[in-house]
């Protein structure tokens, strides 16, 4: 364990930095990168420094959260391909956003576009994307029925990892749901 001990604090630091990133970014792609970056250190914290059943707990944590993240990524990509490159900013001033493809990941602009004529055409597709985001965020919250990874992860995680898991990481799901799914798809949230 002494050989592995020098990695414990850097993993905690990477996870804390990524957690801060999740809560402060205004770009959906960067949000997703930080979201994933929180999962990797926690996986290794549980796997290397966890309790007796740490391998099972870390793999269960990884499978649940990775599957949810892939579903969330699909929803994010659908949102990306439906963004409008010409965005109206406060005061009626227009500016061109986006890359060579003409699409962007800007959360503020996506929210503005969603409140206008809707980010994604078609009610069915909007509800489907909202459902993908809901599954991704609900798994991280964790909500029933995608919560079964949590007891194993908490019991097997080292004390510092369990504190960060309970204190901040579980709140990421609620924050992401409120910040992204509710603000961009309010009509799907009501249904």
Residue ranges and their predicted role:
Residues 1-70, 154, 158, 167-168, ...:
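Internal transmembrane alpha-helices of multipass membrane proteins
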Residues 7, 28-30, 43, 80, ...:
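Intrinsic disorder/low-structure terminal segments
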Residues 24, 62, 130-137, 164:
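Hydrophobic alpha-helical transmembrane segments of multi-pass small-molecule transporters/permeases
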Residues 38-39, 143, 174:
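Short active-site segment of divalent metal-dependent hydrolases/proteases
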Residues 71-147, 177-191:
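Juxtamembrane/interfacial segments at transmembrane-helix boundaries in multi-pass membrane proteins
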Residues 161:
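Gly/Pro- and small hydrophobic-enriched strand-loop and loop-to-helix capping segments
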């Amino acid at each position: 364990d002494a050989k592995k001990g020098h990695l414990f604090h850097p993993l905690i630091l990477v996870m804390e930095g990524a957690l801060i990133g999740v809560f402060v970014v205004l770009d959906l792609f960067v949000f997703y990168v930080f979201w994933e970056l929180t999962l990797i250190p926690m996986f290794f914290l549980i796997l290397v420094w966890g309790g007796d059943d740490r391998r099972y707990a870390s793999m269960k944590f990884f499978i649940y959260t990775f599957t949810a993240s892939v579903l969330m990524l699909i929803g994010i990509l659908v949102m990306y391909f439906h963004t409008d490159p010409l965005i109206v900013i406060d005061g009626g001033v227009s500016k061109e956003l986006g890359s060579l493809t003409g699409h962007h990941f800007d959360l503020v602009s996506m929210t503005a576009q969603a409140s206008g004529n809707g980010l994604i055409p078609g009610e069915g597709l909007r509800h489907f994307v909202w459902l993908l985001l809901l599954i991704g965020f609900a798994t991280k919250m964790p909500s029933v029925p995608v919560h079964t990874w949590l007891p194993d992860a908490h019991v097997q995680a080292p004390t510092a990892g369990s504190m960060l898991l309970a204190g901040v990481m579980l709140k990421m799901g609620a924050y992401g749901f409120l910040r992204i799914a509710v603000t961009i798809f309010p009509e799907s949230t009501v249904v």
